[in-house]
Structures are given as C-alpha cells and as structure tokens.
Regions:
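Phosphodiester-processing cores and adjacent nucleic acid-binding clamps
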Residues: 1-162
Length: 162
C-alpha cells in the first residue's frame, strides 16, 4: 500500500504548448534528435517510432511533466557548470533521454529495451539516477528547493554496510 502521494508540479510551458506537455516534449526531442544527426533517411522511421512510443508511455503513466522537470534541472545544472553523470541505471534505455542530451547512450544502437525503464504496467515511478559531484549536489538541493518549495520535496538516502 502506498503511504504517500507524489505530486508532480505543473511546469510553465510556452503558451503554444500550455495544454499539451507531451507535444512540447516531442518537439524538444525531435529538435535534439535532428541536432544529434539521428534522423537520417535510413533510420528516420525507426527513431520516430521509438520516440513516439516512449512519449506515449510517459503520457499514459502521467510522467511527462516529471520528465520535463528532470530535463530542466539537468539543463540548469549544466549551464551553471556543474558536472553530472546520468548514464547509470535502466533509464539509459530511453531514447527520449538520449535525444534530450541527458544520457550519452543511443539505446537503438545498443538494442536496449525501453520497457526495462518504464512500461504501463509498472506500479512505481521510474528511477532516474543522476550523479552530481560532491560540491554540486548541495546546489541541486538548493535549486529544487527554490524551484518547488522546501515543503514540496524530500530527501531519501540509502545506507549500506559491509
């Protein structure tokens, strides 16, 4: 039984996309896919089909704005000169994350299954592992607190012993 409810904040989107975050996400993904040189005549259909599939799953699961928040956060951190690594974990199997410059692994090239990251039958939110340098992680906390309010976020930590 879930003892908590996750509230994904509504993001300020360009007016043209205010009522359709998924269309905004798709535009960003397509623009970046073209920028990465992925939409060549030989593989355009394969990449567009995978992009549309992933975005449809994000939309069905209600995670489009969550993903847009992750994109905004990583972009802000990158612009501020902070180092981060986002290639660990199953979300590296997402072409959307690759197109949005969050990961550097082309899941089609390496035949990675998106459904390992997210599928409509999954009960839990997807686990997005992003590692920040030690000094930067506090800047990330500060950014998120300022953006969404201290009362709207929580910190989770796992301790391991040997």
């Amino acid at each position: 039984m879930n003892e908590y409810k996750i509230n994904i904040p509504r993001l300020k989107l360009p007016k043209k996309f205010a009522k359709s975050p998924a269309k905004y996400l798709r535009k960003m993904v397509i623009d970046n896919a073209e920028g990465r040189g992925l939409l060549t005549p030989e593989n355009r259909d394969e990449y567009l089909q995978r992009i549309d599939h992933e975005i449809a799953v994000f939309e069905r699961c209600g995670y489009v704005e969550y993903l847009l928040g992750v994109v905004k956060m990583t972009k802000e951190m990158s612009l501020s000169g902070m180092s981060y690594f986002a290639g660990r974990g199953v979300f590296s199997a997402s072409l959307v994350f690759y197109c949005l410059l969050i990961t550097n692994i082309d899941p089609i090239r390496y035949d990675l299954l998106f459904e390992r990251f997210l599928n409509p039958d999954r009960i839990n939110m997807p686990d997005v592992d992003i590692d920040f340098d030690d000094d930067g992680r506090y800047r990330v906390f500060q950014y998120i607190e300022e953006k969404y309010g201290k009362e709207q976020i929580s910190h989770v930590i796992t301790y391991g012993t040997m």
